[in-house]
Amino acid sequence: MKRNFPKLIALSLIFSLSITPIANAESNSNIKAKDKRHVQVNVEDKSVPTDVRNLAQKDYLSYVTSLDKIYNKEKASYTLGEPFKIYKFNKKSDGNYYFPVLNTEGNIDYIVTISPKVTKDSSSSSKYTINVSSFLSKALNEYKDQQITILTNSKGYYVVTQNHKAKLVLKTPRLEDKKAKKTESIPTGNNVTQLKQKASVTMPTSQFKSNNYTYNEQYVNKLENFKIRETQGNNGWCAGYTMSALLNATYNTNKYHAEAVMRFLHPNLQGQQFQFTGLTPREMIYFEQTQGRSPQLLNRMTTYNEVDNLTKNNKGIAILGSRVESRNGMHAGHAMAVVGNAKLNNGQEVIIIWNPWDNGFMTQDAKNNVIPVSNGDHYQWYSSIYGY
C-alpha cells in the first residue's frame, strides 16, 4: 500500500530555562509543582481561534484519560501547554493547532491535534476535529535546554541542533523518492529558526486537572490482549502489521509477524519487489481464512456500536484507508487496526486506533471517517475487514 512523499515540514523549537510556580488544582487545593524548564516553539502567527482553544480546554482531559485507561496507566493530573503550529520551509502552517499535554513532572505525555475539517470528513457538528496521540512528545522532552529545529523527510522527523547536526528522532515508513537527493539540506536564507514569535510548550496555560472522576466514570473497551509488538519500517507491509497485531491479540499469542505474513502471501517475490509489496483486501481475507477466522468485508467505516460489540467479543477490525492528499505512490492506501473504543464524559464517542507506523495509539471521532496520521496526511476510512 503506497503513497508519495510529503514535502519537507519544519517545526522550529527553541528551548529556554525558566522557573515558574505551577498551581495544581487537585481535590480543590493548590499545590506548587516543581520548577519547570520551558520548550519554546517558533511560530509565524500566534493567533489561535477562540473556539480552537475552547475545544482543547474542554475536551483534552477526557481524550487523554481514554488513552491512559487503554495503556492501564494510573490516575493522574494534566494541563495544557501553549499551542504551537508546524510549518513548512516556506513558513506556512500545515493548518493544524497543536497543544502539548503536560504531566505534573513537567513532561509532555501527549499532543492534542486540532484540525480544520477536510472535504471528505463525514461528521458535520463542528468546524474542527480533535485527536490525541503521543506524536512528537518524546522528541520535545529530550531537548529542553537547546535551540533546535524539527524537520521531516521521507525517513521521518529529525532534530537539528545549533551545531547543525541532525538526529532522527521519529521514524516514519516513507520510501525515499528516487529523484530526490539522499541528503536533503535546509534551504539557504529560509531557515525557520528566523521566525520571531514563540510559544512556551512546557509552560502550563491553566491549573492542573485531576482525571480521578473522569477515570472512574469513563467507559473504555479494548481488545484484551492487544499489544504493539512491532512497527512498520521502510516497506509496504501495513496490512501485514495490522493483521499480525490483531491475530496476536485475539489468539493471545506472539507468533504472528508482518514479514512472515507477507512471505506467506507473496512467496515468489524477492528484494525490493517483496519489500514494497502490499496486499489487496482479498488477500487479507484469504490469509485470515487460513488462520481459522471468518473475516467479513464491510464497504464503510464501522460504527461505534459495531466496534463496541466486536471488541467485546474478541473480534478484531482492520481499517482500510485511502489517502486524501494523493491517490498515487507509496502508501496511497493504508491499513490500520482498531484497538477499542471509549465514551467520553461529555458523551463523545471515540474509536481507538493503532497506525503500524506508531509506537502508541490515537483517538478518532467515531463519526469522522477521515483519520489524520503522524506524518501530516489524512486517510479516508472507506472499508473495514472484521472478524480477526
From Swiss-Prot:
It catalyses: Broad endopeptidase action on proteins including elastin, but rather limited hydrolysis of small-molecule substrates. Assays are conveniently made with hemoglobin, casein or Z-Phe-Arg-NHMec as substrate. The active site is at C238, H334, N355. Its EC number is 3.4.22.48. GO terms for molecular function: cysteine-type peptidase activity. Residues 26-214 form a propeptide. GO terms for cellular component: extracellular region. Pfam families: Peptidase_C47, Staphopain_pro. It is an enzyme of class 3 (hydrolase). GO terms for biological process: proteolysis. Keywords: Hydrolase, Protease, Secreted, Signal, Thiol protease, Virulence, Zymogen. Prematurely activated/folded staphopain A is inhibited by staphostatin A (ScpB), which is probably required to protect staphylococcal cytoplasmic proteins from degradation by ScpA. It is found in: Secreted. This is Staphopain A. The lineage of its organism: Bacteria, Bacillati, Bacillota, Bacilli, Bacillales. The gene is sspP.
